[in-house]
Amino acid sequence: FIFFILGTLFSCKKTDSHPDINEKLLRILDDKIKHKKYYEIKKKNHIQKLKKEALLYKNNDSISYHLNNLIVEEYLGYQCDSAYIYSDKNKEIANRNNNEIWLYKNLLQRSVLLSTTGLFVESKEILDHINPEALPSPLRFSYNSAYECLYSNLSDYSGGDSPYNKIYKNKLADYYNSAYKALKPGDPFYYLFLSHKNRVENNWSQAEQNVNKFLKTTHPGTRLHAIGSFCKAVIDGKLGNIESQERCLIYSAISDIESSTKENRSMQDLASILYQKGETDRAYKYIQSSLEDANFYNARFRNIQISKVQPIIEETYLQTINTQNKQLRWS
């Protein structure tokens, strides 16, 4: 199956508007979905390698903490229950060594994990008990980023019609601003969070420029490329660049599969767009893939989001199948 495609095709940047490009990419995505297991095996093998290395250094707390941290990061977008196990290990190591920096890093990472799985109250409780002034400079960005993750997920969960959504958006603006200020220009995340800030301020053209700068630092097939491509898709949608929006969602979905990122959003949004265009078969296939990922990751609030869309697409898909079967019987 397809492992490599032309670099000019597989890049979320401005290209000539042509629907054939999107169709070619959709065929690649179809193939990737068929071979999700291959990428899952790669992911599992990489994690297993880290676990074996961690066992070799189980008596060295410094190395163990570092390796456990890497394992949590691998599990963070892949399988939340396993991420909690190694997060607990590092909390124990940090407390045993009375190491405040290790403990802060662990708490911030755990807060992100909690909000990603829909445990918003528990995530906020951790962050509210941290004094940002006590944090060392390198962790200031992580602190603001963790709050950004919390309010971003709360905003997604509540939906645009919720009276709380505006509150979450205002909080997001504050933490976007604080997050990018904690970084220096040239840091890739500086441009990503500056782009987020531009979006909240409705400066969509500037947001596009900054997310493009971030995307240049990422590589296809990685979680960061998936995130950047999704953010660009959101911006393209607001700017009315519909074909580019769809294209960037495809890039993002492909990178999610190749990096075995199960906590994702692109496939769900892509399914909705294709459904609106009347491409019921693909929409059904993509929303089922999205639901499968959410169930695997155990993302409660992502399941709720998908459940609002999946039955509508499924009903139309089944109606189409029934109509086709009737036509075959009478032909």
Predicted features along the sequence, with ranges:
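Selective detector of the "anchor" transmembrane alpha-helix that sits immediately C-terminal
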Residues: 330-331
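A "functional boundary" signal
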Residues: 1-326
